[in-house]
Amino acid sequence: MSHFSVLVIGENVEQQLAPYHEFECTGTDDQFVQDVDLTVEAKARFDNETETCLKAPDGTLHEFFDEHGNWRPEFSQPDPKAPVHDSGRRTHFIPPGYEKIDVPAAMVTTFAEWTQGWYGMKAVPFGAEPDKAGEHKYGFILLNEAGNVLKAIKRTNPNKKWDWWEFGGRWSGFLKLKPGASGELGRRGLMGSCADDSPGRADIARKGDIDFEGMRNKAGVQAAERWDKVEQATGGLLWTNWESVREAHKGDIDTARNVYHAQSAKVAACKALGDPWGGVDEYLTPRDQYIQQARDSSTVTYALVKDSQWAARGEMGWFGVSRDEVATDDWNRKFNELIDSLPDDTLITVIDCHI
């Protein structure tokens, strides 16, 4: 479960985000929900599944649980390790002469029964229609006249990206307004968390009212100050980055850590930044490049939605960049180019998404 920021370009924010809702959480049964056939997947899983059961002295097989998922009293007992708050918990009991074994699932249950239990979907009797507004809302199993599985259907949105969202949230105040310009603030995140609570910030504003260049300039100045502080502390000496040290000591992570953290220049850099165990390898980047990276990233969110099309780093098809070739710098550069090309009356909205 995580939060991430999304920049929505244009009007009708709710409609633009709608194609990406997680049906299992929103419960919104709309045109974006699809019936996904899981039959082949389910059968392959069932064929390889095993069940733990008891083999009686006469060779018959017995399950620990009944058809409702409850312990069978003859094959269970109070759990002596159960905590006080769960004193009713039970555990396996193996009667004398019985043997606990793993057997193919097909030996103790039918494919229809197993599929209902595994996927949590109820069966639709032969000749009946699924109740998509009720018990079959999130999926169902179609049975033939003999009670065997015809299809196992999961109802979901394959394009799901979020289960809930809000304006601003943890990124409230992300946008810097130009002097005299107006915008709107959404709600802050948990415990009042936000991107920037200083005056002149917004979560919703027109592109022409947003001081994107000011955001970049501030980030660039701060990056230069940090880089110069590290440069002064190390006297211009470099250290070997973590990836290289780890590769040099492959298979011995403790030695790699010790060697990496013992480098005098690395120690000086961490001390200068007031974070003895922090990551400082980014300061091995040349100064001008480091500053440019900071400028570019200052206006960038995790994902972007325009004309109801979702894009994120690694999913940049409509940016004209191969998914396999996308790097952070490429994403940030294309993101900024798009923002700068927008008409000044374009609505810009920052969203806090959760998944």
What are these regions (language model features)?
Residues 2-3, 353-355:
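Histidine-centered active-site/metal-ligand motif
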Residues 1-337, 341:
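Acidic (Asp/Glu-rich) sequence patches and key acidic residues
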Residues 347-350:
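A cross-kingdom marker for long, charged
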